[in-house]
């Protein structure tokens, strides 16, 4: 059985939306993209280096499309990103030119993936997918990088409940 590990940058008020850049995810008029940048330094780089070891990825479609448009051309910053298998949960997409991409349709496909053999599976971004995984008790570990900032609004890691 494989472990599913969620890696996420979050704020003190639980926002996980668009940590990397202003254009990353502007849905719902989110204007704080790139909020993690002021907190990156050599220590953070070393932590990320260890966490970005080669592991298969499980991504929601929206996050995949952001990754697909960026990482193939910037793979020096994430060694192995092009070689690992990228499992994408999508009801609309079926193909990608990005090597080693496999599309999954539903929860049953995710459960089969988890119950199979192979490396750990990392989830990055993918807020809606994370909610589905948490609701169905499929997350084995949460690796959260909590930053000392509050944004007041944005997509949250933990849904209200």
PLM regions and their residue ranges:
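Enzymes that bind and transform nitrogen-containing heteroaromatic metabolites
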Residues: 1-161
């Amino acid at each position: 059985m494989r472990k599913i590990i969620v890696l996420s940058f979050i704020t003190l008020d639980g926002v996980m939306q668009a940590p990397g850049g202003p254009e990353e995810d502007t849905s719902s008029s989110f204007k704080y993209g790139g909020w993690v940048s002021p907190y990156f330094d050599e220590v953070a780089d070393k932590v990320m280096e260890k966490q970005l070891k080669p592991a298969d990825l499980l991504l929601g479609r929206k996050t995949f499309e952001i990754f697909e448009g960026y990482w193939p051309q910037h793979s020096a910053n994430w060694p192995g990103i092009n070689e690992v298998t990228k499992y994408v949960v999508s009801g609309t997409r079926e193909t990608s030119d990005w090597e080693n991409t496999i599309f999954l349709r539903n929860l049953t496909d995710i459960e089969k993936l988890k119950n199979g053999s192979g490396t750990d599976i990392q989830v990055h971004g993918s807020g809606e997918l994370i909610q589905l995984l948490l609701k169905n008790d499929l997350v084995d570990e949460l690796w959260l990088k909590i930053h000392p900032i509050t944004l007041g609004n944005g997509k949250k890691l933990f849904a209200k409940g």
